[in-house]
A protein has these predicted regions:
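C-terminal catalytic "cap/lid" subdomain
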Residues: 2-310
């Protein structure tokens, strides 16, 4: 009997912020992932890198201040670095948790490049905030380098483009490992954004929305289910208002209607809903669960969360 294929998208809550936090958080996350594996799902994992890529970007910028002759580190390289060290902790935590349960399955992290459109309007309207708060002097220095900054509370922040994912370069490798019943960590942080130039791939100065990348990954893998872990238990209507209403189920048509009404926050729930709609499409089989990871890492699919179907 063919196993059901599931893609699990981990939010930054499932990873922590600092290195010690990440070590502990990945242990809890591994328990939830192991539950799916024990129930005989074919599992592929993707994850956020919000705090981590910001720390890497800041660290590399500070390094360049000490050594001006050093070439500034591109965003695409920062993305690759974040995939490496988050994947390292994740795959080891999952491997250990599986062995504790008497299950042996190889766990691998694939450095993943995601193709974006050079004409994506996001390149003309950068919106994704990265890195620490900058002083006015530092902000001016960034602008002289050709980077975009925006004034925020307490100072300035650098902003970069967040283009939509078009294709995944390493999808065949991910499929091969997954079909061999191995656990795969891929498309970390939305993937390394790249532009196609003939036979070459060139890193783009951008970050990809990780929920949309998770949806694209699930689509290309022809997965049965996409699980998006976030900071809230359910998708809610009128979120944060006195008449807030959590939803246990939602259809694609209902999701589209709620989007038109402006129910979902941009950069928050909206990309998750967009990912769900894109992944499910016209399929009567595919489904998306949006929910929160329990603090103890216990089973995340016991009737909690919001299930989205056609």
């Amino acid at each position: 009997m063919k196993k059901k294929k599931i893609v699990i998208a981990l939010g930054h809550e499932a990873l922590g912020t600092t290195l010690p936090e990440q070590k502990e958080a990945t242990k809890r996350t591994a328990k939830a992932v192991a539950d799916f594996i024990r129930e005989d799902y074919q599992v592929v994992i993707t994850h956020s890198n919000g705090p981590q890529i910001g720390m890497i970007h800041t660290a590399m910028n500070e390094f360049c201040k000490l050594y001006p002759e050093y070439t500034a580190t591109p965003m695409s390289v920062c993305s690759a670095m974040s995939q490496g060290y988050i994947g390292y902790d994740l795959q080891n935590a999952i491997r250990a948790e599986l062995l504790n349960k008497g299950i042996y399955k190889p766990v691998s992290t694939i450095l993943t490049q995601v193709v974006v459109d050079p004409y994506d309007e996001a390149f003309y309207k950068p919106s994704k905030v990265i890195g620490r708060v900058l002083t006015e002097e530092e902000a001016e220095a960034e602008e002289k380098k050709g980077n975009h900054v925006v004034k925020t509370e307490g100072g300035y922040r650098r902003i970069v483009a967040a283009p939509k994912p078009m294709d995944i370069v390493e999808i065949d490798a991910i499929k091969a490992l997954s079909d061999a019943d191995q656990i795969v960590v891929a498309c970390g942080g939305g993937g390394i954004p790249v532009l196609m130039q003939d036979n070459n791939l060139k890193g783009a100065s951008a970050v990809i929305e990780k929920d949309l990348a998770a949806g694209k990954l699930a689509e290309l893998l022809d997965a049965d289910m996409l699980v998006i872990l976030t900071s809230v238990d359910n998708v809610c209507l009128n979120y944060g208002q006195p008449d807030e209403k959590p939803l246990s189920t939602m259809t694609v048509a209902e999701a589209k209607k709620c989007m038109e009404q402006g129910q979902f926050g941009e950069g928050d729930m909206l990309p998750k809903i967009e990912a769900a709609i894109n992944f499910i499409g016209d399929s009567a089989i595919r489904s998306v669960l949006i929910t929160k990871l329990n603090k103890d890492g216990s089973n995340i699919h016991g009737g909690m969360g919001t299930m989205i179907t056609k």
